[in-house]
Amino acid sequence: MATNITFHPGSVTKEERIKFVGHPGMTIWMTGLSASGKSTIACALEQYLLQRGVTTYRLDGDNVRFGLNSDLGFSEQDRNENIRRIGHVAKLFADACVVAVTSFISPYRKDRDQAREFHKKDGLPFIEVYVECPVEVAEQRDPKGLYKRARAGEIKEFTGISAPYEAPISPEIVVSSHTQSIEECVEKIVNYLLEKDLITLK
């Protein structure tokens, strides 16, 4: 980190921003295996919240690798950096009173915990959502053909096959995409946000 820099605070307070936008920001961090349903649930949740007056933006694991993280591969070190960057980006969205919905495998607990700490430091809500799905089911879905390629040895360090996935120990929310519909998963997340008074629907 550079040492010849100074943080420049703005003139808009958190309270003012919440008043103008209409609600506080937060990050809803979805984690789970590839093909567990993270992106599908995130898309549905974004649509649901936007249609009800909640400013929401989705950050997708594949999408950010086309730009911001295009220089990163899938080694453990690169995965760590991938999540570190997105943790900061999500925090910026949350600070702007946007509900950031992230869908990243984010296989390592320490990386997810680090993202949580970024938010905690600035008093921003961080809701970890574990999208639970047995690897057998995810492999059967395999919409991108990645599991097949991993089994064939064409993809090294593939989460769930040749690289570990560390499931959350105490996430705020658990949804089971193999037993619950997309609508049921979204409903469970929204109900949590309402119960915690984090959002108000129009």
From Swiss-Prot:
Coiled coil: none annotated. The lineage of its organism: Eukaryota, Fungi, Dikarya, Ascomycota, Taphrinomycotina. One of its GO terms (molecular function) is adenylylsulfate kinase activity. It catalyses: adenosine 5'-phosphosulfate + ATP = 3'-phosphoadenylyl sulfate + ADP + H(+). Catalyzes the synthesis of activated sulfate. Required for methionine synthesis. The gene is met14. ATP binds at residues 32-39. Belongs to the APS kinase family. This is Adenylyl-sulfate kinase. Disruption phenotype: Leads to methionine auxotrophy. Disulfide bonds: none annotated. It is found in: Cytoplasm; Nucleus.
